[in-house]
Every structure is written in C-alpha cells, then in structure tokens.
C-alpha cells in the first residue's frame, strides 16, 4: 500500500503505528425547563475548559515554544469572546434548549465563516472552533476525551485529523511521527509537530 501526502516537517520517523479515532458525539436538541441552571452549568464548563487550555498552553510554552502555545492562546481568546458566549447563552435562554445544542449550533456557524475565508491561516480558525465545540460538548455530556499523553515510546500517531488540544497533550519524546488525512503545512498539527 502506498500513501501520498505532503511532508510538514523534515526527516523521517520509524515506529509503531498507533491509530487514534476521535469519538463522534451526536448532539440531540433537548428542551430544558430551568434555563438558569443550564446557563450556570455551561458557564462553569466554559471556565473549566478555559483553565485547562491555559494550563496546556503554559505546558507547551515550557516544553516546546511560544509559537505552539499561541495556538491555544487563540482558543482561550475565542472562548472569552463575549459575542460568541452571548450567542450561546441567548440560545439557551430564548429557545429553552440544552447547552450542548447551543454550543454546536454557534460553533458550527463560526467554523463555517472561518472555513469560507480565502486566507489559509484564517481557515485554520475553523479547526479551532471545531476543537472548542467538541471539547465543550464532551464536558457538558460528561464524556472522556482522547488522552494522547500516554502513547508509548516510538509511536507514529495516525489519525484522520488532530485538533490543537489533542496535539498539545502529546509527549514529544514518545512520538516519532504524525500522519493525518487532513491538514497541511500550516495546519495546527503540523505546527505542533
């Protein structure tokens, strides 16, 4: 079998392939009667996710470089955007819908806008929005995320795509290579690799 792709980093890596499948989450529109409690839960999860992202960013800055940490700083900025948060909160309150459905709808709208832009770097913001969306929804639903920090020494990570938050958890001493179906030289996973 031959696989063709674009090299994003110099050199080669020889190791054992570790295939990572990102679990898909199906979000169902669900009515809520206590919108204040739903907003409070959403706000708590949003703050927790921002704190975790800040910790990942600081860890990256200590262990890699500021360039990689900036990607996650961008996530924090997006999760702190009052317009974005207000849209989600207003959907929960006005439509009386669950937080995960509001997060999915608003993040998908923003991701579509970023993806339609001509600038390749701005298009990467679509991946940021999808990453933020998936992390928030999993936390709201109480689901676990992939933990890539425990990959064994000599791993070649193979995935459809890697989100910035997934890549930030990698131990660079253990990962000898990364192969993804999506992305290119300017993708976050290539930058983090």
Regions inferred by a protein language model and the residue ranges of each:
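Non-catalytic, soluble scaffold/interaction modules
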Residues: 1-192
